[in-house]
């Protein structure tokens, strides 16, 4: 758990490079997320299974890593403006769509807005680039579960319904996140 938690923390600390006006996403931010989860749980925290606690800790650390954008990732995002994600972004942000149609350029503001709106989707890219510790999988905590939980941070809760998870309550974890 510690290895992936630190990976999430280290990526979260780099968010400030791409979003210089955002709150620092460092240990304090992650501790605050954990504190809120703890407060929301109240006495029910004693009923959590070990795998649920691990999922919550990892989600606290990794839920915003989609906002961590390396220079290479920034260039890739800017050069792929013909994807359905960009088309959807322009559809829901018509002023940006009109500006892009007019200039053919993605401004830094547009790129940041696109990443902010889609950061929950980018979690998969970030977590898939990290070797997953076999010990986590052996304990029933696989990468796809964490990705799904982190992505729920930006999706309706019903995306987790009928998920087939019987070992833990992924819906509860998502609500706490």
Kindly label every feature range from the protein language model.
Residues 22, 45-46:
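Short basic coil micro-motifs at the edges of alpha-helical modules that engage polyanionic partners
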Residues 1-3, 177:
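C-terminal effector/catalytic modules and regulatory tails appended to multi-domain proteins
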